[in-house]
Amino acid sequence: MKVPEAAISRLITYLRILEELEAQGVHRTSSEQLGELAQVTAFQVRKDLSYFGSYGTRGVGYTVPVLKRELRHILGLNRKWGLCIVGMGRLGSALADYPGFGESFELRGFFDVDPEKVGRPVRGGVIEHVDLLPQRVPGRIEIALLTVPREAAQKAADLLVAAGIKGILNFAPVVLEVPKEVAVENVDFLAGLTRLSFAILNPKWREEMMG
């Protein structure tokens, strides 16, 4: 069964809600409560979870720590992922200082082509030249945060693929051409702002999208 992309996004939301509930000392929850907090229906919660198995007990609900653990497993957060940043300009540097990667993601490399940046200390490491990617990626780094200019994005992606990267979080406003076995997630701020402008001008569409 194919899992809709929107369902994965909602699972992430459910997980964050469960983490909040656990922090508040809540031991049990229900699809109704999760749905209310996630702004979706209880039916949608149950449907999203059903893609991956049977969770909870009818009339009893879900045990918060158990469902949290199951969602972390589904989303691949029960392990440590090695990250690198390629492109140490303003955005890359800001991401290097970001404290919220959590326990499942660890920055293990920083890369650029600018000789003035290479060798500069950053977050307990140093910026290295992208030519070293083939030596640094295998066995250590699975995911790259790509923060280079648009015109350099495809070449950087090619270098990452050749080095053995498994996934790319792409901040460049360009569609990358990569092998199907390499996962790509695009972060496009302008596209997000454009969706917001459309949603503001079309409130009925926004209400339908929110269920």
From Swiss-Prot:
Keyword check for Repressor: yes
Gene3D superfamilies: NAD(P)-binding Rossmann-like Domain, Winged helix-like DNA-binding domain superfamily/Winged helix DNA-binding domain
Recorded GO CC terms: cytoplasm
Localization, UniProt: Cytoplasm
An example Gene Ontology molecular-function term: DNA binding
Residue range(s) of DNA binding per entry: 13-52
Principal location: cytoplasm
Keywords: Cytoplasm, DNA-binding, NAD, Repressor, Transcription, Transcription regulation
Pfam name, any one: Put_DNA-bind_N
Keyword Repressor among record annotations: yes
InterPro entries xref list: CoA-bd, NAD(P)-bd_dom_sf, Rex_DNA-bd_C_dom, Tscrpt_rep_Rex, WH-like_DNA-bd_sf, WH_DNA-bd_sf
GO BP term, pick one: response to redox state
Binding site for NAD(+): G87, M88, G89, R90, L91, G92
The protein's role, per its UniProt record: Modulates transcription in response to changes in cellular NADH/NAD(+) redox state.
Subunit structure: Homodimer.
Protein family membership: Belongs to the transcriptional regulatory Rex family.
Name of the featured protein: Redox-sensing transcriptional repressor Rex
Native organism: Thermus aquaticus
